[in-house]
């Protein structure tokens, strides 16, 4: 789920924190990708006649097809992906996981009703909501990525928090996920829509945490409290508090503690035994692997093993897989060129000189003529 309404809130209150880009603009960038989120997307999106793709043995292959081809697309555009997999969910997430299971069961009932009525649109709609990612899907995804030469990181807990840790450690440029709580975990740069199919023509949204904090005029702790008020995976929020009011309350009272002390109990319902402090600590000090000594390596794909796994075991086309392997090898050759900005450090002095030069150029253009009028050029 992530954080309810955070993307729109940032667009409304801190628009300078968002920009849109084409995938080619990330050439040479290393990106930590929320693997579980991506695999779940592929299970929902990569389908045939409304059903997940399967091989002759009836095994699901949507996740493998999506992972293989979308990863190749990123690599062809010069991106170096690192896939981060979820570990054990935190105790605070148990309520959210139970709600998700209830929603899946309800969707299953609605899908069955749609089948009885022959309603194709609703069959597809509700069937997608019943999709569940299994440990087997994740293990197969890891195997595929390693054979492709793409680094895999196993998070001890939440993948988004591990991605954020990699960004903070300078190991990667950004976190690639659809879950906005990557920002709440402290990822300074977050990319949405990175693993979407090219056919959807969705620009990549790039969020900058630092800009959001500056424009909102919030500290990181206040931003986390805002996210808890909006609604997160780890606890309920105060009933009656929407995004606009949440911003106003943080601006006025600065913390959830003071909000709870001052708001009207007649207007707003604060959850009993509300574990917002535990949720706050989870965002501030998540369970992650230390990244400082972590070595991320992109290696040559193992063509023979990929053919064995995807063709012999999973029923993919050998010609397509071998062409994919060729694309990976070619992409590795071009991505090693790196980005131009990785060779230089832009200092504040350099920025100031550039600004001063622009001012001087502006003065020259605006030089008045003898009669006090501006010269035409």
UniProtKB/Swiss-Prot annotation:
Cite the entry's keywords alphabetically.
DNA damage, DNA repair, DNA replication, Endonuclease, Exonuclease, Hydrolase, Magnesium, Metal-binding, Mitochondrion, Nuclease, Nucleus, Phosphoprotein
The segments labelled Disordered in the record are: 94-121, 354-377
Q: Where is this region: Interaction with PCNA?
A: 336-344
Note down the stretches annotated as region I-domain: 122-253
Q: Which GO terms describe its biological process?
A: base-excision repair; DNA replication, removal of RNA primer
Q: Where is this region: N-domain?
A: 1-104
Query: Which residues does the annotation say bind Mg(2+) 1?
Result: 34, 86, 158, 160
Recorded GO MF terms: 5'-3' exonuclease activity; 5'-flap endonuclease activity; DNA binding; magnesium ion binding; manganese ion binding; RNA-DNA hybrid ribonuclease activity
The cofactor note reads: Binds 2 magnesium ions per subunit. They probably participate in the reaction catalyzed by the enzyme. May bind an additional third magnesium ion after substrate binding.
What PTMs does it carry? Phosphorylated. Phosphorylation upon DNA damage induces relocalization to the nuclear plasma.
Residues the record lists as binding DNA: 47, 70, 158, 231, 233
Report the principal subcellular site.
nucleus
Subunit record text: Interacts with PCNA. Three molecules of FEN1 bind to one PCNA trimer with each molecule binding to one PCNA monomer. PCNA stimulates the nuclease activity without altering cleavage specificity.
Role according to the record? Structure-specific nuclease with 5'-flap endonuclease and 5'-3' exonuclease activities involved in DNA replication and repair. During DNA replication, cleaves the 5'-overhanging flap structure that is generated by displacement synthesis when DNA polymerase encounters the 5'-end of a downstream Okazaki fragment. It enters the flap from the 5'-end and then tracks to cleave the flap base, leaving a nick for ligation. Also involved in the long patch base excision repair (LP-BER) pathway, by cleaving within the apurinic/apyrimidinic (AP) site-terminated flap.
Tell me which PANTHER family the record gives: FLAP ENDONUCLEASE 1, FLAP ENDONUCLEASE FAMILY MEMBER
- Name used for this protein in its record: Flap endonuclease 1
Organism phylogeny: Eukaryota, Metazoa, Placozoa, Uniplacotomia, Trichoplacea
């Amino acid at each position: 789920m992530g954080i309810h309404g955070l993307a729109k809130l940032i667009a409304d209150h801190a628009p300078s924190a968002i920009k849109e880009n084409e995938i080619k603009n990330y050439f040479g960038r290393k990106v930590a990708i929320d693997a579980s989120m991506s695999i779940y997307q592929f299970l929902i999106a990569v389908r045939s006649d409304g059903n997940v793709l399967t091989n002759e043995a009836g095994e699901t292959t949507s996740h493998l097809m999506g992972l293989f081809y979308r990863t190749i697309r990123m690599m062809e555009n010069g991106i170096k992906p690192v896939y981060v997999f979820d570990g054990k969910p935190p105790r605070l997430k148990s309520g959210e996981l139970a709600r998700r299971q209830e929603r899946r069961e309800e969707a299953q009932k609605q899908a069955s009703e749609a089948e009885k009525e022959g309603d194709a649109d609703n069959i597809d709609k509700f069937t997608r909501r019943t999709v569940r990612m299994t440990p087997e899907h994740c293990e197969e995804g890891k195997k595929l990525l390693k054979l492709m030469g793409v680094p895999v990181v196993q998070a001890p807990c939440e993948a988004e928090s591990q991605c954020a840790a990699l960004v903070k450690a300078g190991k990667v440029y950004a976190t690639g996920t659809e879950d906005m709580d990557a920002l709440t975990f402290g990822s300074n740069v977050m990319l949405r829509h990175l693993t979407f199919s090219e056919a959807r023509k969705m620009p990549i949204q790039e969020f900058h945490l630092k800009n959001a904090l500056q424009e909102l005029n919030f500290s990181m702790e206040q931003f986390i409290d805002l996210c808890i008020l909006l609604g997160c995976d780890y606890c309920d929020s105060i009933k009656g508090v929407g995004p606009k009011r949440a911003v106003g309350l943080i601006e006025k009272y600065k913390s959830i503690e003071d909000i709870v002390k001052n708001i009207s109990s007649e207007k707003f319902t604060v959850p009993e035994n509300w574990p917002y402090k535990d949720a706050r600590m989870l965002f501030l000090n998540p369970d992650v692997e230390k990244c400082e000594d972590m070595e991320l390596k992109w290696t040559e794909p193992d063509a023979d093993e990929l053919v064995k796994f995807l063709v012999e075991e999973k029923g993919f086309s050998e010609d397509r897989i071998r062409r994919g392997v060729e694309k990976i090898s070619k992409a590795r050759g071009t991505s090693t060129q790196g980005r131009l900005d990785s060779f230089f450090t832009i200092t504040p002095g350099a920025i100031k000189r550039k600004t001063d030069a622009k001012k001087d150029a502006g003065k020259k253009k605006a030089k008045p003529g003898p009669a006090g009028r501006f010269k035409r050029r």
